[in-house]
Amino acid sequence: MIVKYIKGDIVALFAEGKNIAHGCNCFHTMGSGVAGQLTKAFPKILEADKLQTEWGDVTKLGSYSVYEKYFRTHKAYCFNLYTQFQPGPNFEYSALMNCMLELNEFGENKLIKPTIYMPRIGAGIGKGNWDIIEGILDTYSSKLEIVIVDWEPLL
């Protein structure tokens, strides 16, 4: 469930050790938007996508791959949510629903709900309607605390 909206830099939040999730396509293409920013800063995010999934595999739509970054006291997760099959304005609401059902399992059996930071997933390059996306996130993430990050550069 969405617990708050903040202004910030999701790349910096991941570098600080926060769990994040972002939308991507099924063709190992993370060259623009939030995915592009993340893979430029953390190339292993794209490497995890390529190692854990097949290029152009339609069956990964609605699932995710994950990159684990280790810190001294914990590990942070970057979830690559397959919210659209092809790059561009091709966001699929049903894929997000399935991604969130799977991601929600990450929060099962945890004493404290995990916090996941996300951009306005699917509403940028994917051209999804944020009002619908927001409803999906709230409905399918009862075991998570989601923080939506509206991009604002660090000064």
Swiss-Prot record:
Macro domain mapped to chain residues: 1-155
* Pfam family name, one: Macro
* Entry-linked CDD domains: Macro_Poa1p-like
Gene3D superfamilies cross-referenced by the UniProt entry: Leucine Aminopeptidase, subunit E, domain 1 (3.40.220.10)
Q: Which InterPro entries match?
A: ADP-ribose_metab_enzymes, Macro_dom, Macro_dom-like
Q: Name one GO biological process term.
A: peptidyl-glutamate ADP-deribosylation
Its name, as the record gives it, is: Uncharacterized 17.5 kDa protein in tk-vs intergenic region
Q: Which gene encodes it?
A: y06D
